[in-house]
A protein has these predicted regions:
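Phosphate/NTP-binding elements of NTP-utilizing enzymes
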Residues: 1-164
Length: 164
């Protein structure tokens, strides 16, 4: 742990943009997942009791794409205990936490409490149709939490929700 955070200019620009909903479409290996991990980490450090939820097409994909990166970024003095490998969760001493989930287990995404304050949708073009309106949008409706949403993906044709 304790990896120094280094961002390209375009990543820094996306990170500091104050928009509530952000979408990033780009080719493979440009650093989308790294940026998502940094954004979730910083979000949880900024204020106590925040909840970041990072969702990928499958649990195994999210474990490979973001979990290892996230674990390398966190400073041990910021977290409570150790990253939870089975739950794919990092708890912070300020009460915030980051949880990773997959859309291959959609029922695990319904009724998450407290509602997330930051949601990352990784490789969204590969997530089933209508997932955003059926599962994610209700999570953003809590007026007190006002969840920010960061959608990232490599494009995949024109027949998916990411394209729309």
């Amino acid at each position: 742990m304790n990896h120094k955070i280094e961002l390209f200019d375009f990543q820094q620009e996306v990170l500091i943009d104050p928009s509530r909903f952000k979408v990033m479409a780009s080719g493979r290996r440009v650093g989308k997942s790294y940026l998502a991990a940094v954004a979730a980490y910083q979000h949880c450090l900024e204020e106590p009791n925040r909840r970041a939820l990072i969702i990928g097409p499958t649990v195994s994909m999210i474990r490979e794409s973001i979990w290892l990166t996230l674990k390398s970024l966190v400073h041990t003095e910021h977290i409570s205990g150790y990253p939870r490998e089975i739950d794919l969760e990092i708890r912070f001493i300020n009460g915030s936490k980051i949880t990773l989930k997959g859309f291959d287990r959609p029922d695990a995404l319904r009724g998450i409490s407290p509602s997330p304050t930051f949601i990352v949708l990784d490789e969204f073009a590969y997530i089933k149709q209508n997932a955003f309106t059926e599962v994610i949008l209700p999570m953003t409706s809590d007026p007190q939490r006002k969840a920010k949403v960061f959608v990232i993906s490599t494009p995949k044709g024109i027949t998916n929700d990411f394209y729309k």
